[in-house]
From Swiss-Prot:
It comes from the Eukaryota. CDD domains: LCL2-like. Residues 1-20 form the signal peptide. Probable component of the endoplasmic reticulum-associated degradation (ERAD) pathway. The keyword Signal applies. Keywords: Signal. This is Long chronological lifespan protein 2. GO terms for biological process: ERAD pathway.
Length: 122
């Protein structure tokens, strides 16, 4: 008569062991594993341009609206760099401005490199 109890005990231990193991994998691989306690993940920014177009169209500017920063300036070459902390801006003679990573160069080094490139020496 002890056999049915033994089989029941073995099956119960096996069931709870499997359940604990799969709960571990669910939690490890982002399945939640919390028994219904799922955390709300923030949504990524959409990959299409609709959001940007809405922001651009809603911006109030009576002069020139910079496409990269949505800043309102008097002339296109006055547009600021999007990441002023890590980018350096130079204005070219044709009313065009460009921004590039400072890259650890000394102050003004980017402008020198652009000038050399414009002369064909770089």
């Amino acid at each position: 008569m002890a056999r049915p109890y033994m089989i029941f005990a073995v099956l119960t231990a096996w069931f709870f062991g499997c359940n604990a193991q799969f709960g571990f994998f669910d939690q490890m691989f982002g399945g939640g594993g919390g028994g219904g306690q799922q955390q709300q993940q923030p949504q990524n920014v959409r990959s299409d341009s609709v959001w940007y177009q809405q922001q651009y169209e809603a911006a109030q500017c009576s002069h020139y609206l910079c496409p990269g920063t949505l800043s309102c300036v008097h002339f296109p070459h006055h547009c600021p760099c999007a990441w002023e902390g890590v980018e350096e801006k130079i204005e070219l003679g044709e009313g065009i401005a460009i921004c590039a990573s400072k890259g650890g160069w000394a102050e003004g080094e980017f402008a020198k490199k652009v000038e050399l490139a414009r002369k064909g020496m770089l």
